[in-house]
Amino acid sequence: MVSLEQYLLQSLNMALGSLIQGETSYTNSFNIKIREDGFIFVPRLPCSYILDDELYNEIFLIANASLYPQYTLLKQNATYFIPLNGNDIHVQRGLFFPWRKGISERLVVSDLEEFTRTLGEDSIPIMKNLKINLNKLNHMAICGNSGSGKSYALTYFLSVLKQLSELIIVDPKFDTPSRWARENDISVIHPMENRSKSDFVSEINEKLSQALHIIQKRQAILYENPRYQFDHLTIVIDEVLALSEGVNKAIKEAFFALLFQIALLGRATRVHLLLVSQRFDHTTIPVSVREQLNVLIQIGNINKKTTQFLFPDLDPEGIVIPIGHGTGLIQIIDNEHPYQVLPLLCPTYYTKKGIL
């Protein structure tokens, strides 16, 4: 049986071709080293090819397809050089390609209510081999075009967060989140036919202002006792884009200012934002708020255009996106997960009638 190292070396020898001027491992031009967390492409310098982003991406495309489904290569935004041990200057550096063992697998939940009751403390399962620790969560965004499965994914997160956090829910569409909240006896801020949109956003601003006041009180407690553990508070806003368009300028600016302050100050005080929108450009939320998000989910059609706001530096070419409803990309920026973007399959679950 061919070893993984030999298999990968053969794949690169056959596919790189003209990009490296016909040089191969057979002419001792490069080699491969396998590590637990990835593999290293070791060029023997000087060489006739350039070690640049084009070569790095080409190796990624070849290796990612070759290693699937045993490994998932993690896409880098730029060439990843690492130093190698040894005194021979010809082979003292390599191009590193990090990976995760296996592929993304969808979590299937037969009874959502029972499932959420048995969850571990502060744990949010995303896929079979991926969980988020709520204590490491700053703020979260779910993005996707209409019909991509955002509401279905949001209902799952609401059901899980109900067990772990106090919830404030804003539902501009008066749709799925409102029905879920009705079934779970949680109040929702939603539009009413006898009120203007500016009045509706003003009510939201009032609620955000109360949350900011909670943050300030908690900061004072942390000043005296830095180890104090607060209960989580999560502010869930569905269709943020619907709130930021077509409202009075002063009210919109107040909304953005409150979002920014909560995003900036909420982390240490366990006050989180969960924002859902069809897009996250500067007209939806301020860029300064987007920069505070550390769990980013893009569902639906994945290309450079759809990922430009949540993942501005990412070229999704070569990433194996699963087929089906509720699939896309996820990035978790903390000290427990690889910071690179991963293929995502949102959980499939069964819940009470009349919510979805």
Residue positions per predicted region:
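Short acidic, glycine/proline-enriched loop segments that cap or flank alpha-helices
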Residues: C47-E54, E224-Y228, D281-T284
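Conserved ATP-driven motor cores of ASCE-family P-loop NTPases powering translocation/secretion/packaging/pilus
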Residues: F60-L61, S277-G354
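Hydrophobic, Leu/Ile/Phe/Ala-enriched alpha-helical segments that form helix-helix packing faces
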Residues: L8-E23, I59-Y71, F157-L161, A211, ...
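Structural motif
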Residues: A141, H232-I237
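P-loop NTPase catalytic phosphate-binding loop
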Residues: I40-L45, F96-A220, L241-N301, C346-I355
